[in-house]
């Protein structure tokens, strides 16, 4: 176990052990947000902020841990964000929880602990999270894991909580999640393409995220694998070639070997009749560059692109300001 259990409250009446615990001090950060079901048990000070819960919670909203504390489930954690963060940030958090990635920047103390555990092999390689390293072997803040929430669960929970405070905003945000993504880059691209024009996006519908594509025999010979996944796969009308937008993040696409692999993959997909559009972070983060990208996508999917009105441009600038952030600070 990376962290020891919290001290029992009976032996930690002044909560010194709670405040100094590695999970509190080095991972969660101060203040820690607590759920309280009784007004008399609310605790608000420098290190904790209490949120009063007066209604009965749906089953599964509170989960037990091996650390001597109970925690809000991923779904209920997201729901509690709905009243406190920008809607775009809520959508981004939903993408992360429903996706196969997390962004976690360890403090120096936790980094040293991870190094010691890794060198001593105390944690199995299949313990749940795998850190992504760059092509040069550099550690990153990006981690791989299984989704914390299924997309269907998100929709069902949104329907169940509509009448609660923040429920309508939560439901709106949930409907904006287009699929399962594998990186912040894929989330940002998905939001730019799918968000309604009146909210700053392009309003392109009809694409799915990380669609599994079984390769043909000839495509397998080119790429050396039996399947691949399309980051964004657009369904193109009138029998035209389906469009795949590939998000080529610098972390794993920054060396010669990666370039060769990407080229083989693109050729294999083109051999099967797909149109493949590589997309770099610079192309979406720079608004002038993205103008070329969105017009290319519109042309490929058979949409007559219409220039944005001054109001739509202001909404786009606001959307970009919200999504192009340091992802490690999301929700804070």
Where are these predicted regions, by residue range?
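Short gly/ser-rich loop at a beta-strand->alpha-helix junction or flexible surface loop bordering the NTP-binding
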Residues: 1-165, 309, 317-332
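Surface segments flanking catalytic/ligand-binding clefts of nucleic-acid enzymes
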Residues: 137-332
